[in-house]
From Swiss-Prot:
Homotetramer. GO terms for molecular function: metal ion binding; superoxide dismutase activity. It comes from the Archaea. Destroys superoxide anion radicals which are normally produced within the cells and which are toxic to biological systems. The gene is sod. PANTHER family: SUPEROXIDE DISMUTASE 2, SUPEROXIDE DISMUTASE [MN], MITOCHONDRIAL. This is Superoxide dismutase [Fe]. The keyword Transport does not apply. Its cofactor is Fe cation.
Amino acid sequence: MNDLEKKFYELPELPYPYDALEPHISREQLTIHHQKHHQAYVDGANALLRKLDEARESDTDVDIKAALKELSFHVGGYVLHLFFWGNMGPADECGGEPSGKLAEYIEKDFGSFERFRKEFSQAAISAEGSGWAVLTYCQRTDRLFIMQVEKHNVNVIPHFRILLVLDVWEHAYYIDYRNVRPDYVEAFWNIVNWKEVEKRFEDIL
């Protein structure tokens, strides 16, 4: 036995009030997304961790394949939402274009910010079913990549560093935009917190 503590996931507070992203994301939409959906991933991940803990302590068998698949889904959802809340902010403080090293890399790898925005938006709009558009950085090639993640855990490239994410699950926008995902994606650009995204990038260079 050792005295190391086993920790579990917790729902974080948002870095802004629930009405801070209006009119682009309503208070109602953000509240439900955070308190219900993000909380569900916290609960799902913790339930799987406890199930695995109990099986190990009692030396009983579990369906490892099913448990690990479900765990990756819930943990992926938990982590991606952490990035999502952090890379948004009030429209009067956010939006526009990035600056500094991130702007230089976007121009290097995409040709222009306009081209990057177009490709990222296309990745978000065309994601099949539920998923995410994700801007990442590959240290091996010193390049920015766009990933189109299905659900929370499919098409994720290992070891790529996450910079910017956009949730395109219907629960992220249906109250405000119904089934018109392109309008939601367009509105997202008004609330991107580029200072936070730039900080994420600078921290890994």
